[in-house]
Amino acid sequence: MPALPDNYGGNYVSSISARMEDHDDLELQGIVSRIRKDLTEFGEHYAKITQGGDISLAICKTVEDFGKMATSKDIDYYNCTSWCNFELYGADFGWGKPTWLSPVFTIKQKNVACLIDTRDGDGIEAWISLSPEDTALFESNKELLEFSAANPSVSV
């Protein structure tokens, strides 16, 4: 990735999309391999579009492309983000540290997962939003249930 200009301020966040076709290898190793490949290609593409040009235009184009992909009815879009190691439970803006953190999902969002450290730091919470059909499958996965607790209570 190229260095950002000296007069650039703020944070730049982007996403990497790994497009999987029906005939692609859908095993975990195949998916990880595809994400790594697409991450490399993203870096190369980003380097090209920002060289000598206006970085804000490159950012706008990236956001526009992502929006088209994420809202397409022809694509099953899955989004996973991790807030782990951000030490969010240590943040205090003057009214005290948070008791419990959660992402905000709308009713219409599906196929979204957000990983967050537990307050005590001994585990990870996975906040997941799925369609009703996928939720039923997810909640009946015996192997998954061995390692999880659905809807844990807030420990203060």
Language model segments and positions:
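Acyl-CoA-dependent O-acyltransferases
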Residues: M1-V156
